[in-house]
Amino acid sequence: MLQPKRTKYRKQFKGRIKGVAKGGFDLAFGEFGLKALEPNRVNAREIEAARRAITRYMKRAGRVWIRVFPDVPVTAKPTEVRMGKGKGSVEYWACKVKPGRMMFEIDGVSEEIAREALRLGSAKLSVKTRFVQRIAE
């Protein structure tokens, strides 16, 4: 699973996901893509599950680019533990996704295969997504 090799600080504030994506909203690498339509935190397990679903359906043909990276540490306290006594330990890594963010890109396969592969991948994610295609010039 994806996670940073090293970070400046072990834990982060929760924060809020406001506004729309300022960057990473266009197709940069592939012909087809999966774009987020709502804000949410997508964890590393979801990203990996989506990647596996996409590559399995494509039968290793073509190429997949993951355009998001889980760089936010999410902490949790153990169950049945009283409040206080400090912040919990890091449970998993997540990525804050804003609306309009391109999450996955695909190239080297037909539109039907790409559409179905990304549909299967989107089922693994906790955000609503849309299939996008490069406009032929």
Swiss-Prot record:
Name under which the protein is recorded: Large ribosomal subunit protein uL16
InterPro entries membership: Ribosomal_uL16, Ribosomal_uL16_bact-type, Ribosomal_uL16_CS, Ribosomal_uL16_dom, Ribosomal_uL16_sf
UniProt function note: Binds 23S rRNA and is also seen to make contacts with the A and possibly P site tRNAs.
Gene that produces this protein: rplP
Cross-referenced Gene3D superfamilies: Ribosomal protein L10e/L16
Keyword rRNA-binding recorded: yes
Keywords associated with the record: Ribonucleoprotein, Ribosomal protein, RNA-binding, rRNA-binding, tRNA-binding
Coiled-coil blocks: none
Subunit annotation: Part of the 50S ribosomal subunit.
Alphabetized PROSITE patterns for the sequence: RIBOSOMAL_L16_1 (PS00586), RIBOSOMAL_L16_2 (PS00701)
GO molecular function: rRNA binding; structural constituent of ribosome; tRNA binding
Gene Ontology terms: biological process: translation
Protein family membership: Belongs to the universal ribosomal protein uL16 family.
GO cellular component, one term: cytosolic large ribosomal subunit
